[in-house]
Amino acid sequence: MVMPTVVSDRMGTIDFIDYTNNHVFSKCQTDSLNTVNNGSLKHDDYLHGLANGKLVAKQMIGDALRQRVESIDSEFCEPGDEDTFFVADLGEVYRQHLRWKLNLPRVKPFYAVKCHPDERLLQLLAALGTGFDCASKAEIEQVLRMGVDPSRIIYAQPCKTNSYLRYVAQQGVRQMTFDNADELRKIARLYPDAELFLRILTDDSSSLCRFSMKFGASLDSTDGLLGLARQLGLNVVGVSFHVGSGASDPTAFLKAVQDAHVVFQQAAAYGYSLKTLDVGGGFCSDDSFEQMANVLRAALDEYFPAHTGVNLIAEPGRYYASSAFTLACNIIARRTIQDGSAVSVSDSSSMSDDGSVNNGDARYMVYVNDGLYGNFSSIMFDHQHPVAKILRAGGRTMYNSVAAHESSAEDAIEYSIWGPTCDGIDRITESIRFREILDVGDWLYFEDMGAYTKCSATTFNGFSNEHDVIYVCSEPGAMALLGL
């Protein structure tokens, strides 16, 4: 049993659970600090280390969740004690980086800060040597405060605010994107020394979130834009594209790389020697990543082989953040539905002798302390479908057990899960069945909650968008990089 030492800072909304657990890791994991950036990590070693790391991660996350929820009595706790909270495993971010280096060794990741600008996450990625894709002055400021060199930042926002352009010029952040003539003239006026990436239009029809309606120059317009850039004396250094967030069609990368190759040839005709291709984001953290990476890697090897000297970068966001964060929510209210109607306290036919509601064929609406206006906003705009699992019910903690999961048994109880606001659309789950009876004070947890969650939470209805994060680290390499 691995025992944690807890260092907490509730006022700063940060807890860190530090584990002394190097003995449970394989040599692959303890050596990976030295091999992650030199390309010597082998596939079999990675898989062996991954399996070990995942097992330890589950134990650590479970311990952190258990310690927190078992210390809270919803009947007597202070306001805020039972609030939603996250557990973040920085070791998962580290494993994802190993996975990236194994599958796309030539492509340097520039983490999309917008996805989840968590300070600890950014610190680890900076230590791993990644770059950063920033879309605003605030994101650039946050990265620069960590001591990251401006050359490791790309201002990947084709339509920029004038004052932000002046700011990045002062800070020496030179790399940025454009996709239209007006933006070129603005840059020529405010930051003529910038290093520019022409963002091209892609087919993002298979993506969860499409960007082509808003950003990207068509191939019909790229030649003219390159000509204008040359006329204005601007320095175009590369091409960028984005196949959409949460892409599902690997061939989208192939077509985009082919189009980028065409633009490289167009640029050469104007005397530009482009040095970088930015393949954007769209990478998921699930099993589809390897398929996407295989197609992209083959396309890059064909159209931009290593001997050409072209630098390759990407802008992954959810790939790094999604699976690293687990969210715990408290059930704050319950409504019993019998035959399609809410059960009234005065309905004696539905009451037991002790005053409790008979289960029978009842369904329940449970209300939790987070919802679509909070960390579940991704349901609305990111097309996500978070799956609830039982963390604690009936005085028992059930994390990662059979009882925690949805059940298809005939006698399983049906629930819908709702957020805390007064808006009728604030529903997290329309229907899910569990074997357990859930009640006020019980806890649910949701995995894969690191992407576009906390960063887009609002304060609608006066509910807080500041939630505690408990950090664990299931990889010694990550702990070493962070000095923990």
Swiss-Prot record:
Binding positions (pyridoxal 5'-phosphate): 245, 282, 315-318, 452
Activity regulation annotation text: Inhibited by antizyme (AZ) OAZ1 in response to polyamine levels. AZ inhibits the assembly of the functional homodimer by binding to ODC monomers and targeting them for ubiquitin-independent proteolytic destruction by the 26S proteasome.
Subcellular location per the Swiss-Prot or TrEMBL entry: Cytoplasm
Reaction(s) this enzyme catalyzes, per UniProt: L-ornithine + H(+) = putrescine + CO2
Originating species: Neurospora crassa (strain ATCC 24698 / 74-OR23-1A / CBS 708.71 / DSM 1257 / FGSC 987)
Transmembrane segments: none
Xref: SUPFAM superfamilies: Alanine racemase C-terminal domain-like (SSF50621), PLP-binding barrel (SSF51419)
InterPro entries xrefs: Ala_racemase/Decarboxylase_C, De-COase2_C, De-COase2_CS, De-COase2_N, De-COase2_pyr-phos_BS, Orn/DAP/Arg_de-COase, Orn_de-COase, PLP-binding_barrel
Record bears the keyword Cytoplasm: yes
Cited function: Catalyzes the first and rate-limiting step of polyamine biosynthesis that converts ornithine into putrescine, which is the precursor for the polyamines, spermidine and spermine. Polyamines are essential for cell proliferation and are implicated in cellular processes, ranging from DNA replication to apoptosis.
Biological or metabolic pathway of the protein: Amine and polyamine biosynthesis; putrescine biosynthesis via L-ornithine pathway; putrescine from L-ornithine: step 1/1
PROSITE patterns given in the database record: ODR_DC_2_1, ODR_DC_2_2
N6-(pyridoxal phosphate)lysine, modified sites: 114
Gene: spe-1
Protein name: Ornithine decarboxylase
GO CC annotation: cytoplasm
